[in-house]
A protein has these predicted regions:
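An aromatic- and glycine-enriched ligand-binding surface/loop that stacks and positions planar moieties
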Residues: 82, 101-278
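C-terminal substrate/ligand-recognition segments
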Residues: 238-354
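Short coil/turn linking the two alpha-helices of tandem helical-hairpin repeats
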Residues: 45-46, 52, 117-126, 342-343
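Long, intrinsically disordered, low-complexity segments
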Residues: 1-4, 76-78, 99, 157-219, ...
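Conserved, well-structured interaction surfaces
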Residues: 1-48, 62-75, 81-96, 289, ...
Length: 406
């Protein structure tokens, strides 16, 4: 992350010295640099909290920065995002070759997220009682109202996690992967690979069956949560099929029309696991008793070779882009910001925002916009997309729910 922040600083310090015939393009590049500097510091701060701020290129080899206070870190991140959203174009500016670059909506989304996180996290630490829910709601409303480009929920939820539908109309900020290069991690270089990519270890289908990494399963409270979510016609929530690998031939699962859980090479549960049992225990001793694992972010079209060069052998690389911020997340964060006291400025209400997310998968409307409905919906919509811990952190529920969900 600090390598990327340093590269962003290099761009910021250099771009103003270069003559551009296209001022919009110069602004777009500068906006990207401010955005990426903000994103890297945001990521570092929410994970480690006590971080130095890299605001400029070092002037000497042994130039070390002190750790910033939380207030200094948030102010720096937010200031960069305000600059970025003023400089960046909407998504229609970029041609097909540049599809997936950050946009004005990317900056507004991360800006709103920063205000929302700051408002929830800092009072829990006692560092500040100031909240920014008005600012968060206003930033999300810019996207919802279409002021920074047209975004929508794609019809098929599962299209948010595959290669074929990368950079779709729901994607607001997406980390681009050029392929499945199995070289070592080499930060700062375009050909840096992702050997030992954690995504391949998330799935029970790690082809190295004796590896501990083949036990990356979901806890059964989450399985029960999804099983309990039904469509208006009584089928299992389609998001369960887009998010996980599990046995869909058991009685509590009612398959929506056209949906079926498949493994590599299109195998169903019984063909892959050699059992009709509802857990992974027969094939994977470490996964005894668990019923599902993650499906997201894996390219299920790759060949399942068992040799050391195979894409499913002991954590080899996957080429699926990471969707860091989706439009559905923006809708739910907007609802949260308003429920927590922010001014409603979008062209839909918080309740309509929540139900818009639910409409996509055909589950019944909720009748009230409150934190309970938002918290539940974020589980169903965003599981295994990297937000759960930070959701609990800003809600002050990390310890409480960690003790329950073990």
């Amino acid at each position: 992350m600090y390598t990327a922040a340093s590269q962003a600083n290099q761009m910021i310090e250099s771009l103003t010295e270069i003559e551009f015939s296209n001022k919009e393009l110069q602004d777009a590049y500068l906006g990207e640099a401010y955005f990426l500097r903000a994103f890297t510091h945001f990521f570092l701060f929410i994970n480690y909290r006590n971080i130095p701020l890299i605001k400029e290129l070092p002037k000497a080899p042994n130039e070390y920065k002190p750790q910033a206070t939380p207030e200094e870190a948030w102010d720096f991140i937010i200031d960069d995002l305000i600059k970025a959203k003023d400089l960046l174009p909407d998504k229609n500016f970029w041609d097909a070759k540049n599809k997936g670059r950050v946009t004005k909506a990317s900056a507004y989304a991360l800006l709103g997220k920063s205000y929302l996180y700051r408002s929830g996290i800092e009072p829990k630490y006692g560092t500040s009682q100031t909240t920014y829910y008005n600012e968060a709601a206003a930033a999300f409303a810019e996207i919802i109202n279409g002021n920074s480009g047209d975004y929508r929920l794609v019809d098929d939820y599962s299209c948010n996690f595959d290669v074929a539908h990368e950079n779709n109309d729901e994607s607001i900020f997406e980390v681009q992967f050029v392929g499945v290069l199995n070289t070592g991690f080499n930060p700062g270089f375009v050909d840096s690979g992702l050997f030992n990519d954690v995504r391949c270890k998330m799935c029970i289908m790690n082809r190295s069956r004796n590896s501990n990494s083949s036990a990356q399963v979901m806890h059964n409270w989450l399985y029960d949560k999804f099983v309990a979510s039904k469509t208006v016609t009584g089928e299992t929530d389609p998001r369960m099929f887009g998010s996980f690998v599990f046995n869909d031939n058991v009685s509590e699962i009612i398959r929506p029309k056209g949906m079926k859980v498949t493994f590599l090479e299109g195998k169903d549960w019984e063909a892959e696991m050699g059992s009709k049992e509802g857990t992974f225990g027969e094939q994977y001793e470490l996964a005894m008793g668990y019923k599902m694992c993650s499906r997201k972010w894996l390219d299920w079209t790759l060949p399942p070779t068992d040799d050391a060069g195979g894409h499913f052998f002991n954590g080899r690389a996957q080429g699926v882009n990471w969707r860091m911020i989706r439009y559905s997340d923006v809708l739910l964060m907007y609802a949260e910001a308003v429920v927590m006291g922010g001014k409603a400025t979008a062209n839909i209400t918080p309740l309509e925002a929540i139900n818009k997310v639910r409409d996509r998968v055909g589950v019944p409307h909720v009748t009230e916009a409150n934190m309970r409905t938002i918290e539940d919906e974020r589980i169903l919509e965003l599981t295994y997309e990297g937000s759960r811990f930070f959701d609990l952190l800003r809600w002050g529920k990390v310890v409480e729910l960690s003790l329950i969900h073990i």
